[in-house]
């Protein structure tokens, strides 16, 4: 029963508008940015993670917490690693942080 409920919650999360937007954005390849524009983009990504007022009710945070995965260290670690990434990975991390923030 727990497995069925978890699967149902995961399907609802993936099929919601946010999940669709995430997968649609991941299919589109961003244009390669010049190296000079990479540093401001990395700083913008690191500072672009807002705190939502209902973050404790988010589905993804609940799923990760039930599996024993803390979300806050994951986001902080991603912020620290953004400055070391290449231009291709900056867009992917930006999408990931946006989805993680949206869900929790």
From Swiss-Prot:
<comment type="similarity">
    <text>Belongs to the secretoglobin family. UGRP subfamily.</text>
</comment>
<keyword id="KW-0964">Secreted</keyword>
<dbReference type="InterPro" id="IPR040301">
    <property type="entry name" value="Secretoglobin_3A"/>
</dbReference>
<comment type="subunit">
    <text>Homodimer; disulfide-linked.</text>
</comment>
<keyword id="KW-0732">Signal</keyword>
<keyword id="KW-1015">Disulfide bond</keyword>
<dbReference type="GO" id="GO:0005615">
    <property type="term" value="C:extracellular space"/>
</dbReference>
<dbReference type="GO" id="GO:1901741">
    <property type="term" value="P:positive regulation of myoblast fusion"/>
</dbReference>
<protein>
    <recommendedName>
        <fullName>Secretoglobin family 3A member 1</fullName>
    </recommendedName>
</protein>
<keyword id="KW-0202">Cytokine</keyword>
<dbReference type="GO" id="GO:0005125">
    <property type="term" value="F:cytokine activity"/>
</dbReference>
<feature type="signal peptide">
    <location>
        <begin position="1"/>
        <end position="21"/>
    </location>
</feature>
<dbReference type="Pfam" id="PF20490">
    <property type="entry name" value="SCGB3A"/>
</dbReference>
<comment type="function">
    <text>Secreted cytokine-like protein. Inhibits cell growth in vitro.</text>
</comment>
């Amino acid at each position: 029963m727990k497995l069925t409920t978890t699967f149902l919650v995961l399907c609802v999360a993936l099929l919601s508008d946010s999940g669709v937007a995430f997968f649609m954005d991941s299919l589109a390849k961003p244009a390669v940015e010049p190296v000079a524009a990479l540093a401001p983009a990395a700083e913008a990504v690191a500072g672009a993670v807002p705190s939502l007022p209902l973050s404790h009710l988010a589905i993804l945070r609940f799923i990760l917490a039930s599996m024993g995965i803390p979300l806050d260290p994951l986001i902080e670690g991603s912020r620290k690693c953004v400055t070391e990434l290449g231009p291709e990975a900056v867009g992917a991390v930006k999408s990931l942080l946006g989805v993680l923030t949206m869900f929790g």
